[in-house]
């Protein structure tokens, strides 16, 4: 059990960490560490608690490396347009094993591989992957981008009385690659995730082609539902989920027990400033200053940016437009976190009192807002992290979908 003496704790921790590493984690400089060690000043009670947490994490015995017999998974799945693995997380929790991953963005690959150190490599551009090289699997997962389908070629075939299939209608879009892999590998089921507007995109033509492709061309029984992430996290985030089974099942989205919306509030995911914020060693002190018990000052908007956002909002309001920054309080539910959050953070700004400018969420808070646990590692820059979480899924929504899908296989 770790000592309660902060100096003794400091000695124990320093056997494993340099002054610089420890200073980064605690949000102090190396001179302060030296002064503690030399007895010139004593660590504050808050720092003492942080040191105790660190010492406890170091004291945990490392598990012996024993060759374990691999447990047979309940099902296998592939992860297309994988992002940082939000959908995968949910299906692994149901006993599934990921046997193939595709994600084109190299920075997202870094985050994904850090959190899912697989034996299989991450494939890049799905358009360059031969369907025959994709392993057989039970479930295909894909959060594919929303793109319009050209109807020029289809209209011509209709006029000539020729048959046309999904390859004609969807060629040149990323949905085509989803369809061709389903066609070639014939999984038992699939789950596709997209923005709510997929249904109305291109005057409904986009969704019509997708439904026709999945049902008529590929022979799947599909159901779909728009679900708001606000049932599970303090964020309005409406996304459509399309589930298909090769065999007819009694799958029904009504089996998902949706908690009332807006019960979760932003205060739950914000860094705690009362001394209870956990020390996350893998965050390396990048987001939160445990010494000062607050997020680093870099997340607070500059006077110039805050003035600009207020003036810009006033200008649009006067013109009758809807633009405005989203100022949130601890009891608020936020707007949708987008991939552009890195630009100015305007859609979700945390109120810090009348005498201080608001601040952006930190990347760790964004992870929490999307339903990722604090164990999730963020190995990329803030800019990349904001984009990745803004493009991700609410893990809890996927978790509930996976829970009712798995038994139907």
Q: Where are the language model's segments positioned?
A:
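A short, Lys/Arg-rich alpha-helix, primarily the initiator
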Residues: 1-15
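Short alpha-helical DNA-recognition segment
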Residues: 16-34
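C-terminal target-recognition/interaction regions appended to catalytic cores
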Residues: 19-22, 44, 295-409
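Residue-level detection of the helix-turn-helix DNA-binding "recognition helix"
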Residues: 27, 38-41
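DNA major-groove recognition helix of helix-turn-helix/homeodomain DNA-binding modules
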Residues: 43-62
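Class I S-adenosyl-L-methionine
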Residues: 52, 92, 110-113, 129-139, 151-335, ...
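Core alpha/beta nucleotide-donor-binding catalytic domains of modification enzymes
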Residues: 61-186, 196-200, 205
């Amino acid at each position: 059990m770790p000592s309660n003496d902060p100096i003794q704790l400091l000695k124990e921790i320093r056997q494993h960490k340099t002054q610089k590493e420890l200073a980064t984690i605690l949000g102090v400089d190396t001179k302060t560490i030296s002064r503690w060690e030399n007895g010139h000043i004593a660590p504050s009670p808050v720092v003492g608690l942080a040191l105790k947490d660190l010492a406890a994490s170091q004291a945990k015995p490392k598990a012996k490396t024993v060759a374990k017999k691999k447990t047979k998974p309940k099902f296998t799945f592939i992860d297309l347009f994988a992002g940082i693995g939000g959908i995968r997380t949910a299906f692994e929790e149901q006993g599934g094993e990921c046997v193939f991953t595709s994600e084109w963005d190299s920075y997202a690959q870094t985050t994904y591989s850090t959190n899912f150190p697989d034996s299989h490599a991450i494939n890049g551009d799905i358009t360059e992957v031969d369907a025959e090289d994709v392993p057989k699997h039970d479930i295909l997962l894909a959060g594919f981008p929303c793109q319009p389908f050209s109807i020029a070629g289809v209209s011509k075939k209709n006029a000539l009385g020729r048959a046309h299939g999904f390859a004609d209608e969807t060629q040149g879009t990323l949905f085509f690659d989803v369809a061709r892999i389903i066609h070639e590998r014939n999984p038992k089921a699939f789950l596709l995730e997209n923005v709510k507007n997929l249904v109305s995109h291109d005057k409904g033509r986009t969704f019509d082609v997708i439904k026709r492709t999945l049902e008529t061309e590929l022979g799947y029984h599909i159901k779909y539902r728009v679900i708001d992430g606000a049932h599970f996290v303090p964020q309005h985030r409406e996304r459509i989920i399309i589930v298909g089974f090769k065999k007819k099942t009694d799958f029904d989205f009504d089996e998902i027990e949706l908690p009332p919306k807006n019960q979760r509030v932003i205060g739950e995911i914000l860094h705690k400033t009362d001394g209870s914020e956990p020390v996350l060693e893998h965050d390396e002190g990048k987001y939160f200053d445990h010494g000062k018990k607050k997020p680093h000052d870099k997340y607070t908007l500059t006077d110039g940016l805050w003035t600009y956002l207020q003036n810009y909002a006033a200008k649009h309001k006067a013109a009758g437009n809807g633009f405005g920054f989203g100022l949130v309080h601890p009891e608020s539910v936020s707007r949708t976190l987008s991939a552009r959050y890195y630009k100015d953070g305007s859609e979700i700004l945390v109120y810090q009192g009348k005498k201080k400018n608001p601040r952006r969420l930190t990347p760790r808070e964004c992870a929490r807002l999307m339903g990722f646990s604090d164990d999730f590692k963020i190995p990329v820059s803030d800019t990349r992290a904001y984009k990745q979480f803004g493009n991700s899924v609410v893990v809890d929504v996927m978790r509930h979908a996976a829970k009712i899908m798995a038994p139907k296989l």
